[in-house]
Regions:
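Membrane-interface helix-boundary motifs at transmembrane edges
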Residues: 9-13, 77-87, 152-162, 221-234, ...
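Functionally critical transmembrane alpha-helices in membrane proteins and complexes, commonly lining
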Residues: 14-75, 93-101, 206-207
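Alpha-helical transmembrane segments of multi-pass membrane proteins
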Residues: 25-38, 102-110, 175-181, 248-252
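Interfacial loop-to-helix transition and helix-capping segments at the boundaries
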Residues: 50-60, 127-139, 183-211, 248-281
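Transmembrane alpha-helical segments and their boundary/interface "anchor" motifs
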Residues: 53-60, 75-106, 114, 118-132, ...
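Hydrophobic alpha-helical segments with transmembrane-like composition
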Residues: 108-112, 116-184, 199-213
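Alpha-helical transmembrane segments of multi-pass integral membrane proteins
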Residues: 245-248, 255-368
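Membrane-proximal cytoplasmic C-terminal regulatory module of class A 7TM GPCRs
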Residues: 367-405
Length: 414
């Protein structure tokens, strides 16, 4: 469905209810895989685990895609009020980001003299350094700051989307090549301003420009995009299998032929990921569209309530899971029987981390006052309906409720 210049409420995107939590628990998987490598005592085991890490390193690119899609879908072609926009975001994302940044700073700091702690907490809030997963929220805030310019840019390129995507893709490949070859491995990162760039590149908006543009353009033609992925499901699955094989072959060449370090071979910012991540994005879109297209009598997809709750909880999962993973790595994982296969211990660590984070997030979002910790606003009188106050999905973890047609009661969705 092409976005039109009108003030009518736009149809609810059910597909995002699936894509958000799937991506969130995959983020948990990335971190679990990265921090449980010590369980492997063989070279082969380490290579297998790092190969899997490489294959799930698409999560940040998917988040960028979803963020741009949601923002564009809500705001493109409409008058933009910065005051209203930031009033919503201050409650939905800035407040929880600041609170969790302070909490992580407190836990990760050995001494807590008030002045030093306040200075460090402020620095971490500004840089996203309080915990390793918070960089994404900083990226989201950067996109918020340039959103009017981004929407204006989309207005200029919407008549030539494929040309714009091709140029953006080529620039992304070139950027990742230069970054991977000269900044991450070469001596450039140790000199002058490039040292700052090397440290902060993962939290810089333009590092992911292709995925933002891809999401923005997808939002302008949602119905056509949905029809396309539903029509080419077999090709999409086949393309993903080939892309996954290519990523693994590339990884093996890096470590076994070129003898590069595992950390370098598993870098998120490398050219191969520019080819792989879009394939995964299309695959996730196809899976989500298949799910959303099969509705029940209430015009909801099957299992909608389950996925809807997880989608609401996904922001909290993202924020809280590092606390749980750190505790498990210290108090549980070392005491798992060594007779258990490494794969089982890694899976259990992921399951406990993701499940615990989901449970805590759901509990928080249903609890008045505490719901603000996960960007929600529950009320004492009606915890379940309180989230109606956050009927915005213009950032990647929040979204509007279904849009009802007056007089028919039928839910519209993309």
């Amino acid at each position: 469905m092409s976005v039109q210049n009108n003030q009518q409420a736009r149809p609810y995107i059910y597909e995002l209810d699936l894509m958000r939590p799937v991506t969130a628990v995959t983020v948990v998987a990335v971190h679990v895989l990265a921090f449980t490598q010590f369980l492997n005592h063989t070279t082969t085991g380490l290579q297998v685990q790092n190969g899997i890490i490489t294959s799930v390193h698409f999560t940040r690119d998917v988040f960028m895609f979803i963020t741009a899609l949601a923002l564009t879908y809500v705001y493109f072609g409409r008058p933009f009020s910065g005051k209203r926009f930031w009033a919503k975001r201050s409650i939905g994302i800035l407040v929880p980001y600041c609170i969790w940044s302070i909490a992580y700073t407190w836990v990760n700091t050995s001494q807590h003299s008030p002045a030093a702690f306040a200075e460090l907490a402020l620095f971490n809030i500004l840089t996203g350094n309080a915990s390793y997963q918070l960089y994404y929220i900083l990226l989201t805030i950067q996109l918020y700051l340039v959103l009017p310019l981004f929407l204006l840019f989309l207005k200029h390129i919407k008549q030539h989307p494929w040309r714009a995507l091709s140029i953006s893709f080529a620039l992304q490949v070139l950027l990742m090549y230069l970054d991977y070859r000269y900044l991450q491995q070469g001596s450039l990162a140790s000199s002058g301003v490039w040292q700052i760039v090397a440290v902060s590149q993962g939290s810089f908006l333009l590092t992911y420009q292709f995925y933002f543009i891809l999401g923005g353009l997808a939002a302008l033609s949602l119905q056509q995009a949905r029809a396309f992925v539903l029509r080419h499901g077999k090709w999409i699955v086949g393309g993903f299998v080939l892309a996954l094989a290519a990523v693994w072959v590339h990884f093996l060449l890096q470590v076994d032929v070129y003898h590069e370090s595992l950390s370098y071979a598993t870098s998120v910012l490398q050219p191969i990921m520019v080819f792989y991540s879009p394939v995964v994005i299309v695959l996730l879109c196809w899976l989500a569209c298949r799910w959303a297209s099969r509705t029940n009598q209430q015009e909801h997809p099957k299992g909608y309530r389950f996925w809807h709750i997880l989608s609401d909880a996904s922001f909290g999962i993202y924020l809280v899971h590092v606390f749980i993973l750190t505790a498990l790595l210290q108090w549980v994982v070392p005491f798992m029987p060594e007779a258990w296969p490494v794969a089982l211990r890694v899976f259990l660590t992921w399951f406990l981390t993701a499940g615990g984070a989901a449970g805590i997030s759901i509990l928080l979002m249903k609890t008045p006052v505490l719901s603000h910790l996960v960007g929600r606003s529950a009320h004492w009188h009606s915890p379940w309906d309180a989230n109606a106050l956050h009927e915005w999905f213009s950032y990647p973890f929040h979204h509007p409720r279904k849009v009802e047609q007056k007089g028919s009661g039928d839910a519209q969705h993309v």
